Amino acid sequence: MEKTKTQAIVKIGFLSATAFILMYLEFQVPLFPGFLKLDFSDVPALVASFAMGPLYGVMVELIKNIIHATITQSGGIGEIANFSVGSIFVYTAGIIYQFNKTRKNALISMAIATVVMAFTASLLNYYVFLPLYQKVMGWPMDAIIGMSKAANKNIVDVRTLIAYGIFPFNVLKGIMLSLITLLIYKKLSPVLKH
């Protein structure tokens, strides 16, 4: 029992450290606002969710964001957003995958998780995160919209920012995370399951 707990802690630590490092390998995606950067730090959390269970995936999300919050200048808002959206993705995929651990169900679970993540990210940004950035960081909404419009002319207000920025960005992110996880999961799962 004690050995199993220790092994789980080591695995979560390794996956969290990997996720934290992957947060720094981010890049801008054309047609999306500059503050939306794609990184693959949710892949280790998704792998944990599939191999060890959905709550382990959420733990990886939590640990990577706590570490990142200590060295960032987003006032913690970016990390709360990253944790919320990433956790929704990995938990949804993991909980569905647990019912039937096949490649087909992994694909289904990641497709559903991508849609859930995109909708949830849209709602959270509209009602929580964008207003928080305004209030805590002092970013005027006009500046956020202006920066977004520079990347995509269809973005003219908060609703179009969600429709042409936040939602499609998270769909793209979910697809990319899913593809990478499909490529590496089979190789990593034996190590993580035992």
For each predicted feature, which ranges?
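Loop-helix junctions at membrane interfaces
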Residues: 1-194
